[in-house]
Amino acid sequence: MSDSSQLHKVAQRANRMLNVLTEQVQLQKDELHANEFYQVYAKAALAKLPLLTRANVDYAVSEMEEKGYVFDKRPAGSSMKYAMSIQNIIDIYEHRGVPKYRDRYSEAYVIFISNLKGGVSKTVSTVSLAHAMRAHPHLLMEDLRILVIDLDPQSSATMFLSHKHSIGIVNATSAQAMLQNVSREELLEEFIVPSVVPGVDVMPASIDDAFIASDWRELCNEHLPGQNIHAVLKENVIDKLKSDYDFILVDSGPHLDAFLKNALASANILFTPLPPATVDFHSSLKYVARLPELVKLISDEGCECQLATNIGFMSKLSNKADHKYCHSLAKEVFGGDMLDVFLPRLDGFERCGESFDTVISANPATYVGSADALKNARIAAEDFAKAVFDRIEFIRSN
């Protein structure tokens, strides 16, 4: 038996296994009715949200229902109780005339969470941030529209946000959108798919994109003559969608390739996850130290980066002496540009991947692990998202 024959057999078995695993998760979601975002609020609970009171919620709901608006309700004994979805709450804020984020800023802000060290929670941070910013109780009034652009051929972000598009042949990927230079309408209709949390979309990636990245210069010369090879993501995708979203998050692999350079060239702000394990921390510092050279390399080739700043944050942090020591070293390096909130090492972040969920989209009623562990991870993700939002708000307003 030749080596190529064995490779093909293993590849076929791997493809079959991927399909089986995906079908198992999907069947479980169908059985448990877990294909929609589970979180709802009782009407009385809305009084705890910013700018809302029990009285003005009652008044707004009455007015909206008189005009024909239908709120979500669920049976509770012999009566029907309000079960407010996040869209219901956003509509209440809109009815009351509360300004949205897009009323302050007309164009999307591009966030890139990056580190050349693999396994430092780049993707988990990105997808958790996307879902948490949308669903955070204190950010619902902003009605944030969020897009995740997956440029990692491993398509992990796609798996978390829309797992059906993370296996098999996917033709409408972020890399293809960049190369084909399609219209805004085609991007929205053909290349962007919704996640389980309404208001958060993803532009998928595929393993085939790795071949595109490796031949990027030649492909750009063939399909996009005259266009700067580092500006393709910004010009062919992001600039066309900047009025349709408030935040665009880019996820790329841990490789110094064309996709990472395009992500850097398109980003308004960079977030660097810093894992506290000594070897990983050292590798991360090497990346941070060489970052100015990388930005200069992109600029020298005719594409100006528009980075406002690079913010560091700790990922996978636990209550250990060596982790605390690395945290203090990170504060020395980043100073005031160190995020004061970190993403801890929690079981919830890891277990959610078993059902292709984030800690925000995972339903506690069907979650396979500890409900308390999921709750702690969700709180950590929400705190992280609020800290990121507040830092960006400070930067944009100054």
From Swiss-Prot:
It comes from Escherichia coli. GO terms for molecular function: identical protein binding. Pfam families: AAA_31 (PF13614), HTH_54 (PF18607). Keywords: Plasmid, Plasmid partition. One of its GO terms (biological process) is plasmid partitioning. Belongs to the ParA family. This protein is essential for plasmid partition. It ensures the proper distribution of newly replicated plasmids to daughter cells during cell division. ParA is trans-acting. This is Plasmid partition protein A. SUPFAM superfamilies: P-loop containing nucleoside triphosphate hydrolases.
